């Protein structure tokens, strides 16, 4: 860390050098291929590695200040370790630190110093100084020891020190909590995507220099181990990690460092991405997860290198980034190719063109050219690729200068020039970066590393960036998207991006517009690339939420959107409020984006974001994203959608192959991957998206409740803590009873998304609503890692109540509880209105957008269309709380629409507002309930007309005497009578269906238990995935059946031939099931059979029943699939 810090402070040149070294190290560590790619890298490898290792080993605390002292702790069992602490901390804090390091309860530890037990006071009081030796002896209790009670969240939090809490709240490092619930442990990793500018900057810069810390910020989740990798990836990983947002990060980080994939850098990256994507639930799973998440993640590994190769020196950086970005561990051998592809993807993601070019094979030169053409690209390339997610971009941006320098050194002056030329481009990039991790922030803050870049960016973005960074930046993830976007937009779809941007709303923000124009200008070449990008992109998309969006975008307007993102990010920085929405966008960071978001929706931009976030952004974006997908990728659409899914999931992994293959194939692959990643995918997408979102939200996970409650309020805190403990218990029970809900519990990645969906849903302000809808954003990426390890990612936006006036999370441990609480509460099951749903656009394209959740479910699209006047439908759903006529009628419409949608294909099923309903039914129900009490509270007696309108032409008359909500009906018109009867029947049917579903679920669970684990799991996952993929095309009613059947089918025929195209899934629920499952299987073959199968299966059911499928079911499936 110190080294890294030193590096940071070093001169720009030195820093670049360092960055190069880091990159090299990363490369070296992560991917051997990289080494060859760049000589300079190689030399540096050693020190960069060193730094990485240091980083990996040191904890965030170490990063702390130079004022720390090192204490040598020797245990009675012979293990020795050192801790670096500040001399003024209390003995209790030291015990907490040690307890956390050893993962034991602090009351079980006894510290002796000079034969004296340390009990209270500060370290200074006991004359502890640098190098002091402390003997650690365990407290042993004799006698009958009752089963230790479950740890409460409070106890878990007590073991945290202020530095950890502050680092978490500032987005620097993820917060890891371990809780014991009955006989199993739950590891929770929370990551805020937000970083304060300093942090953000650090993230990028650090990555460059030491990489660890900066990345860490970005990656946050990936912080320690990931971080190291990150540095290599420099921004990439970071981005990913950011994306990871946390859960995955943890595991991923470890894995990454280890090089879970063989390539350490890559691994890390992958872990980070994977983390991002899914948030690995446990560390071990995390690695897996990460790879699964990003199945492609694996690819990424190889990728990384490969990427580098293609670009040559540029690639080198590229590779790094890429690799990181990819962070996949994709096969190493594959790696090369994949690399390429991935690279492209990333690139493309980043800069389509460049990616594409790279993809082509002539990639190197192309890339170079592209780079030249697209500074952004180059930046991206340098780091975007790494991140592949956007983050990389940001990294790249951050690194941009370094990159540039490297590249320049390498002979890619073009890039540099472009960078220089394209201030805007740089700007955008930084913005993206900012999003990404605050790279902008860093540059802004710390110019030396990226002087040139920062100069480019600094003026316009400086503020924004900083601002962004704090909130948006946090959007690292987001930003990654942003980054991606920005780069990607430019590169990937420069043309698109410009067009999109312009149309989309880039223009809305001047900065965005500028960025866009820069991007556009910058990426003229890419215009050609887009298709390729598209092709490839989907995979990348999968790879990283953000990336994916770019990739998608390129197809259509993604990049525009992305660009918008980037721009947005920048702007957004200023607006905290948008965080929820922002989340949606990759650039969720951008405050602005939020608004834009909506815009984009319309534009189709969303889709880019959507993808990335598809799940995550879940609602707003997702719905838009679905649209987007639709629009934007009309041609590629299917693949895109799939990609979106996959992307989130891990299409990347398939991406390489798929990239080469046709889009549809890729799509399938992706799907498969998704499936593999499935939980991951959905989760991933979500996760990544989520992450991104979260990033945007400064404290991504605040819960509406929190917002409602005064954070400082002790009573609230106690309650929040209790709720949280209960929720966790529920989660863990569910997980272990095969009903994993999102949580899987294993990891609760920050709950950014949770809010985010809501926000996106438009209820940006009403925390409650957002939360509700936001839960939709919850990513359900639960995977089951072997024996009882599950991971789930939740994300949401930070509740405004938890933010200080700069939009940063309040510095207080209680904030953590509230964040966690909201996160979890937002999950569909627990959250009042939460819904996870992947909703298909009306067109029926199956996009990963699923975001019914944000949108509130039932038809997110619908809902957005109808535009509840309350941003969140979910609120509407609970008509009890809120029955205004407007809402009611809206609800009605909505419900109708949603029904049609659902049945139509549009199926936007949402994960029910009401726990186990399809949203449409829920909506119906809600509306019916409101209707039946149609005289809503808000209506006054004299408002029969409004009543009428509300009931769609009902002519009932009410007496006016009754001032309360329930007016007596004087005369009920026929229409209402019929309606009421229908309602009743419908609700009865729904209930029946629900009961049946539950029975069926139980049966399935039993079957799954008896069957071989993998198959069952995959089937399940597939199930949910396919439904998701299907986008709820099937009629809602069919949904449940479809889902189930899908599951059974899957179980029965896990490896159907892949003859059926994925599209089928989209097209018809039944088909989709079959087709999907077969696809999934196919995919599975390619990458993770079970997972894939799961995915496809999942896709099919989801398609049909997203709304119907109970959250558990889906989650369960996901887990299993994973």
Swiss-Prot record:
Originating organism: Drosophila melanogaster
Swiss-Prot/TrEMBL keywords: Nucleus
Keyword Flavoprotein among record annotations: no
Biased composition (Low complexity): 266-298, 375-397, 612-627, 648-663, 746-766, 856-867, 889-903, 922-936, 1086-1107
Consequences of knocking out this gene: Homozygous and hemizygous lethal at the pupal stage. Hemizygous escapers display haltere-to-wing and metathoracic-to-mesothoracic leg transformations and die as pharate adults.
InterPro entries: Midnolin, Ubiquitin-like_dom, Ubiquitin-like_domsf
Cell compartments where the protein resides: Nucleus
Biological processes annotated in GO: proteasomal ubiquitin-independent protein catabolic process
Region (Disordered): 257-399, 596-630, 645-677, 746-775, 840-876, 886-905, 922-955, 1067-1122
Listed name of the protein: Midnolin homolog
One Pfam family of this chain: ubiquitin
Domain remarks: The ubiquitin-like domain is required for Pc degradation.
Assembly with partners or alone: Interacts with PRC1 complex member polycomb protein Pc; the interaction targets Pc for ubiquitin-independent proteasomal degradation. Does not interact with PRC1 members Ph, Psc or Sce so does not appear to be a member of the PRC1 complex. Interacts with 26S proteasome regulatory subunit Rpn10.
Task of the protein: Facilitates ubiquitin-independent proteasomal degradation of polycomb protein Pc by interacting directly with the proteasome and recruiting Pc to it.
Sequence ranges of Basic residues compositional bias: 300-310, 321-352, 596-610
A Gene Ontology term for the protein's cellular component: nucleus
Keyword S-adenosyl-L-methionine part of the UniProt annotation: no
Additional record remark: The name 'stuxnet' derives from a computer (PC) virus of the same name, due to the role of the protein in promoting Pc protein degradation in the proteasome.
Residue stretches of biased makeup (Polar residues): 937-954, 1071-1085
Ubiquitin-like domain sequence ranges: 69-143
Ranges annotated as spanning the membrane: none
Major place of residence: nucleus
